[in-house]
Amino acid sequence: MKFIKWSLVSVALCGLGLSAHAEVKIRSEVEDAYKWDFSLIYPSWDAWEADLAKVETIGDEIVALEGTLAEGPQQILKLEQLSDEIGKLAYRLYGYSGLQRDINLSDNDLLARWGQFMGAFQSMQQKLSWITPEMLSIPEATMMEWIDSTPELQIYRFPITETYRLQEHVLNAEGEKLLSYFSKMGTVPSGIYAAISTADAKPMPITLSDGENFEVTAGSYAMAMTTMRNQADRKLIQETLSQSIIDQKNTYAAIYDAALSSGWAEAQARNYESVLASQLDGDNVPMEVFTNLIETAKNAKETLRRYHHLRQKVLGLETYGWSDCMFPIVDDKTQYPFEDIKPRIISSVAPLGKAYQKELASLFENGQIDVYESVGKRTGAYSSGIYGIGPFVLLNYHDAMEDAFTLAHELGHSMHTQLSDANQPFATSDYTIFVAEVASTFNEKLFLGELLKEVTTPEQRIALLEHQIQDIIGTFITQTLFADFELKAHTLVESGETLTAERLTQIWRETTAEYYGDIIPADDPYMYSWARIPHFYNTPYYVYKYATCYASSSSIYKAIQTASSETEKAEIINRYLTLLSSGGNDFPIRQLQKAGVDLTKPEATENVVKELDRLVSELEAACAEL
């Protein structure tokens, strides 16, 4: 039974905050062509309220089925169809309230509407906690006979089969009801983390080397590390932000310990040997996928050393630390205006066929992209799909190279949603996070290829080469380092140890050295960064999927580029489009294998390390010509 895509809601709750850019327009000053059209979802709040009430009514119909599921296939069919109705409504209700909230985080009325939605569905989860235990009381062989003999049940075969696969980790009805009471308690650590790291965080004023006043926030820190060329200013900004963490390091450690302890308690209650085992089991991912990733990524240490030593040399820096790792080697001032980038992104996806290209182009015309920053708007970017309506993309576009790649990235997600929803019934339309980032990073690679065709200066080429390198470091190396740290921290909690700030900092320092060697000094403020990663507190063992997805998209892209014939290339592209159209109709590992990527073997991740080495060699050669 697919009830609601809670992963989508979780993503929407992560990383809320206001942008650090100055001179931001108010919402009314942004042209309508660059704003979401909410009438695509509902004509009014009255219509939204009516559907929210309808959810309660449908929920009561489902509750009335309690105790009747064993009567036959028609009862199962009724349950699944009613669940689909609630799920489809949930997407629309979430979209109308959540998306509007995200464009004005200071609007208390919108926050209240969002809370109304969340409250209704949390209550619904408790009322329907009996469903899985009752379904599992029916012998699996009987259920399969019912599905075989009832054509309308065929579309539910995979999700129902999944329920039986996981049955050893499902409690009886009373146990599931008891756990549902603690579901909100399990989110308390992440709520406290959001409060201390974002809601209660105050800007920290400093004076830069040129006398300019600067307010340090999480957002302005990220911007400064990638754009500010004065080393002393970057270091001051990093030290200022890090000091705010150091001052509360024991609080952050206590929150993280509570989050991990809560996850471990539920994993034990559900008969898992570890939190990692429980997280992998949800997608039926073999343990070797995780361990292969960690073992392989560490092999990039020497390449990372070469890259950062090159940066230090070209930039002429006597000392080198974390605050020197991210800003570009060359000061390329190329602008990427939104209107100029639109046709280039559309052109870049031509290899995927005219139908894909036309569908992507339509996303620019239908009020589905909220382009520019405005006062009160959530920072960052995402693509959020609403079944039956389509994807909605949030951006904070400022004409920078990173903004252009972010647009390509989010449109990759959006097209994944479009194709899955168009080709799958609601029950299997929801693709897993394990494959989600394949589509987004693949489209970034296509866009990069388009930009490389247009390079006119050595500086532009170096900027694009470095973008590729930083992309691999950020998406593959860093996320694997994060996952490695998580594994070590969870292992300590699961062995009975209480996490302290000193212990976490030690683990972070040791793990960083395993990937970066001596590039980052042991006393660098970066060593407290374990307190700054929201995913650690909100979604354990989430980040490794970024790395495996990157490896998967790289493997598919390379296969297309090196195909020996047009026929072979067409076959690879067709397998890839089939992956994008398959939603959640199979295990993600099997979906990727059908597309030509086997993550149970190390080849895909090893190829990323080789790609990084090749790019660093190209960058070394390009810099030698400056």
Locate each region found by the language model.
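A well-structured
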Residues: 20-331, 342, 622-624
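Post-HExxH zinc-binding segment in Zn-dependent metallohydrolases
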Residues: 430-460, 468-470, 474, 549
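Hydrophobic h-region of N-terminal signal peptides that target proteins for export
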Residues: 12-19
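Bacterial N-terminal signal peptides that target proteins for export
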Residues: 1-8
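Short pre-active-site segment immediately N-terminal to the catalytic Zn-binding motif
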Residues: 334-338, 386-408
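Active-site recognition of the HExxH zinc-binding catalytic motif
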Residues: 271, 398-418, 440, 445, ...
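C-terminal, non-catalytic "cap/extension" segments appended to globular domains
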Residues: 28-30, 39-43, 135-138, 158-170, ...
